[in-house]
Amino acid sequence: MSYTLTTWNDFKNYQSTCYRNYLYASEGLRCMGSTWSVLAPLKGLGEDVYILGGEPHAASTAGTFPEEAREDISAAEIAGLGFHSCSYLKLFVGEVVRDKIAITDGTIKEGYPKPDLIWTTHLCNLHSKWYQEVSRRLGGIPMYPIDMIGGGDAEKDPKIVKYVCDQMEEGIRWLERVTGREFSDESFIKAARNEIKVLVLWGNICALNMHAPAPLDERRLIALFPPAMVDRTTDEAVQLYEALLKEVQHMVETGQSVVPDQRFRIVYFGLAHTYGHPEIARILRDAGAEIVASVYTFGTAGNFRGFVNGNWSWEPIDPAWVDELDLSSRRDALSALAKIVLGWPTWQGVRSYWALEQMARAMVTEFNADGLLLAPTRTCETDFRNGYIAMQRIFRNEIPTVEYDTETVDVRKMDIPGSKRKTELFVHLMEAHKKGGA
């Protein structure tokens, strides 16, 4: 019997409330940017800071309003953005062009809510350009991008950590200058500890999928990690993920799962695409094949032990470690934040293929995978596209491995019939491998 998460509605409500606060704020500060950024510095400006993050907003809009998403993408292309550029970027800019915005509770608001500032990171070539274009179209919104140097073990390199910390420290002075507000180190440090705690808690939740049956499937994982992206700096966010961890631990102890029929365990590398293409997810579900581990859902807003003595580990970090962190000064908090975000799995593989291989080997082993599904996104520069070719060679003689191009939100760029055929082939390969015939 399938287990129903009791915390499900709390997660949906938190995400929708954050978006509604941004849309309808009559006072306070609206802040926009990549939620792949360190968010805690924004909370040093006060509790009335409302955040709209590009990636989770674009993804949730595509899932909630697929027709609106297509109109947004078309509007952005008509306005001059390239056909092959990031689909999330075009959806986001398309809302600005159309002067309307849609959020997860079903609201479509006419009149785009103009942000007071843009606080973001620059990881791929489009990250800062995304918000530079939004700033330009909205009349020149003040913008501060932080240049991130990803790559294997970057969080252990003091030069890289200092480089990121220095930018954030200058960014705090910039925030004071453009808002006219005094920065509170006390509020910032509290938000920093919450931010780190949520990332560690999500890593703990994901690691529980090492058990059989895995308590969570990809559909739930996709739906449960966005609140950590939307705003992970609040006490409420910490409480949400603490409650979820406790519930999933109970599921493991009692052998329960949201999908108890798990004949095949799949490790997935790529951006989450099955939420937009249920016909592909259905092929896997009907065969009892479940994605139990995904670098995207695990590593976009979660932290793990990472590299230990040169080898990657998906084992979780003890949440008590966060409580013991010395965050007594602004610089201490900035350093801890820089290390935690540089340690995100999704950033490791963006700049380092040896890290990508290490993560894949560890995930296949630690999550006891029956198959490896590789689905690079055509328009995402930070997806691990080039590394997938090597991964096919590495794993093809070990476990069934299938690769096909996909797309996050723009169905025009996805070969649905071809992807369905490859997914069916993938199921047959796993069946044959389990019987000893492949």
Per-region residue spans from a language model:
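Internal, well-ordered alpha/beta segment that forms a basic, Gly-enriched binding/recognition surface
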Residues: 111-208
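A charged, amphipathic alpha-helical module
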Residues: 1-29, 165, 169, 173-303, ...
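A short, acidic, amphipathic alpha-helical segment used as a generic capping/interface helix at domain edges
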Residues: 103-107, 348-368, 385-386
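C-terminal regions of proteins
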Residues: 391, 395, 402-438
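An N-terminal, globular interaction/scaffold subdomain
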Residues: 31-117, 122-131, 135
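Short acidic, glycine/proline-enriched helix-loop-strand junctions
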Residues: 134, 138-142, 383-410
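Redox- and metal-dependent alpha/beta enzyme cores, enriched for Fe-S-associated oxidoreductases
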Residues: 27, 36, 41-76, 272-352, ...
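Proline-aspartate-enriched helix->loop->beta-strand connector
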Residues: 115, 364, 368-374
